[in-house]
From Swiss-Prot:
Coiled coil: none annotated. Belongs to the UPF0346 family. Transmembrane segments: none annotated. It comes from Streptococcus equi subsp. zooepidemicus (strain H70). It comes from the Bacteria. This is UPF0346 protein SZO_05010. HAMAP family: UPF0346 (MF_01538).
Length: 71
């Protein structure tokens, strides 16, 4: 079983980086309602589109998701 997206994303945190994964990781870290225990694309994508307390380029999210799947 693949580790949760949140767990993988937290390993990408880097406050000095401008990489999209690092930026998203910092935003998600501050969001207490982010779905932390799932590896389901639809659940996370829907959350980012409809419920997140921040905005993020979903085109960049798609690339981050591909990186997640390749690890």
């Amino acid at each position: 079983m693949r580790k949760a997206f949140y767990t993988w994303l937290m390993a990408q945190r880097n406050s000095t980086s401008n990489k999209p994964a690092a930026l998203l990781a910092d935003l998600v870290f501050e969001d207490t309602t982010f779905p932390k225990h799932t590896d389901d694309f639809e659940t996370i994508s829907r959350y980012l589109e409809e419920e997140a307390s921040f905005s993020f380029n979903l085109g960049q999210f798609d690339q981050i998701w591909e990186d997640y799947l390749s690890h």
